[in-house]
Amino acid sequence: MPKLQLSVAMGDYDRTRALFDGTVQIDGVEPTYMLLSPEEMFFRAFRFRDFDICELSLSSYLVKHAGGNCPYIAIPVFLSRAFRHTAMYVRKDRIRRPEDLKGKRIGVPEYQLTANVWARSILADDHGVQPQDVTWVRGGIDQPGRAEKIELKLPDGVVMVNAPADTTISDLLDRGDIDGFMAPRAPSGAARSNPAIGWLFDDPTATAKDYYRRTGIFPIMHVLGVRKELAERHPWLPAALFKAFSLAKAAALDKLDDTSATKVTLPFVEEQLRAARQTMGPDYWSYGVADNLPTLEAFTRHHLSLVHI
């Protein structure tokens, strides 16, 4: 039987490298890999259905799936995960603690970004700051005029306004026109070096470790998707993808354990790996539903309460 010729869009990660360098093969598939930024992947996937297999925003996937119009079926391969305590920046000259954000203005590139759902969940669960307690200002991080990738309705009581058409939320933060900034990327331009701007949490790593110890949650950002018609026509394909992506991740972890030469352009990586395993266990970046059920349930709970379809 000839192999399926399929397009695969994903990020350039150590956990996917064994796939695109050919070390790991997808059974029954002859792939054409495209290494793209999340913004381009998600826009093309949800607007134009450009890819057969694609890394997807977990939040956008759930919005589209709940609306009955998602072209993809998710596979529990979680290509991006991150503690989003580093996703919140504030004017340190007026915000001393998370609770100070009540009544303030927070810039966001998009309301429904997965990173922002997790960040809002941290504010709500740990600090009592609800989405209705602030005014959300939507705009681009480094270019004006960014809009939501997918249509959504905000919950009752949530107020969001657009940034002026000629400015970015980074500029607004730098000038002090907003009090906070929530995004998966850091502020750009002058805001990046402004001494009055900093992380909401003074030590976000320590705060994230405490969060994990209390909740057992390692936030999921992106999931793997396959076009519905392909999965229906070839029911073996999702399992083949899960197997291949799991093998690629295992290859990346094996390389991290090889200390003969540093594989990552970052000092102290061995200590960071040891610390991650001590805190989170040996299989800290697990795939599959069963091992990630608490994380998925927590995200779904906040997603349903924060984003109305």
Q: Where is each model-derived feature located?
A:
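Basic/polar N-terminal segments that are highly enriched at the extreme N-terminus
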Residues: 1-4, 153
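Short, glycine-/small- and polar/acidic-enriched structural segments
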Residues: 7, 14-145
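Amphipathic alpha-helical segments that form well-ordered structural scaffolds
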Residues: 122-126, 172, 295-305
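Pocket-lining segment of extracytoplasmic ligand-binding domains
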Residues: 146-257
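Secondary-structure end/capping motifs
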Residues: 225, 230-302
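Conserved small/polar residues in nucleotide/adenosyl-binding loops
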Residues: 307-309
